[in-house]
């Protein structure tokens, strides 16, 4: 396919049109008075959102050169979302500002490479200043609530629910977001270890009202293969029956014949038993079975380690205070595992989380860590309609990410104030030449933009508010929700330092690449000729039988 090539100013101007198209759509969502953006969907109802990255992901422009510009800024939003989970709109605004002012200077003859060096120098100084301003969150759940509330566009209910979930599962715990059946948003905590496998047969149920198997102080048999014939496990079954305690079997699968025998004995009342399939797949299944064994003080019966089911003994079985099994999940509460063994396993999983490069693997490892360490909290998001549900779920996920970021690197005053305070770090900073110093000035101007936009979205005059915030010091800033200048820390208008840092770093990175671009190549549009008209003389064919 033929290519179209653009150089110099022409290429950069087209890219900038794309940047502006995307940034202008995204930036209206910023702040507590941010506006909604409605996204059309091919199927189903439109999606209403205030989430910057959701808006950015929808934008595709017709002109391939403009579209490249939009995709560059989309990359800023996506990367910021991946790194910090929030701050996508702020990053987009910063990128647009650095690119816009930078481009004017390049047009006026500034050296793009020197500008980039100046921009990088300024960003480094601002990041250091932000780190110095950050205040640790620690176990201050009020701060956690404030951060979550701000990120959820001022929704106090979401803020308090996330703080409650954090309080219950601690830092190691996992918090997942799911859609609720009703209209209420609630948080539920699963104590102990839960995995997503239910009973193999409903005939194991002991509580028919709830359709659950409930076991008190059961033995737990963990086997990593399929149980084909019951004869293999008869010795261990007989020993368990003699104790009078229930038995939970966790195995890869159970053959229908062996299952039928277990069910018949369960219905007769001679066996208190339940069988579930092992969680996970492949190597992850082996690791999860090992986790269960460590948590319950049992041993995984595996031929790989030389253990056979027919030779299993009672000391290979795990135990727990309580086990609940429904059709979808199995929950093991207060496993009788050795505390040191569990601590050692937790350390091992943490090391694997540090070393993994796959986001999916990291997520699964964190789930395993939570199940061993802190438990799992589920936030059920309820709403009156599907459209509202999606919008609310976006906000809950943003708030959750922001909260985690705050715990990691602390908090700074919100509402764009942290950037205004960081201007002080650039006051005496000079580059090695005039263009580098211009690069520093570009960043100094750009970091005012988030506050200007928050103010503009609230219907006020940006320049006036920015000047007044500059005149104050420390945590003094503008609360756009209440239209009041005040100490932002005391009123809970705070942002995670990590989000503030990552947004600027990613924006500057893409802007630097943009300013040093000299040539853009895209596929040439092919003009498809119109289909030829039907030849005449075909009209009489209607009469054919």
Curated annotation (Swiss-Prot):
Keywords of this entry: ATP-binding, Chaperone, Cytoplasm, Isomerase, Nucleotide-binding
Positions contributing to ATP binding: 29-32, 50, 86-90, 415, 495
Membrane-crossing segments per the record: none
Record GO terms (molecular function): ATP binding; ATP-dependent protein folding chaperone; isomerase activity; unfolded protein binding
Domain of life: Bacteria
Biological process annotations from GO: protein refolding
Pfam families: Cpn60_TCP1
E.C. designation(s): 5.6.1.7
UniProt KW Mitochondrion keyword: no
Subcellular location: Cytoplasm
GO cellular component term, pick one: cytoplasm
UniProt catalytic activity: ATP + H2O + a folded polypeptide = ADP + phosphate + an unfolded polypeptide
Entry function: Together with its co-chaperonin GroES, plays an essential role in assisting protein folding. The GroEL-GroES system forms a nano-cage that allows encapsulation of the non-native substrate proteins and provides a physical environment optimized to promote and accelerate protein folding.
Family, similarity comment: Belongs to the chaperonin (HSP60) family.
Oligomeric form and interacting partners: Forms a cylinder of 14 subunits composed of two heptameric rings stacked back-to-back. Interacts with the co-chaperonin GroES.
Name this protein carries in UniProt: Chaperonin GroEL
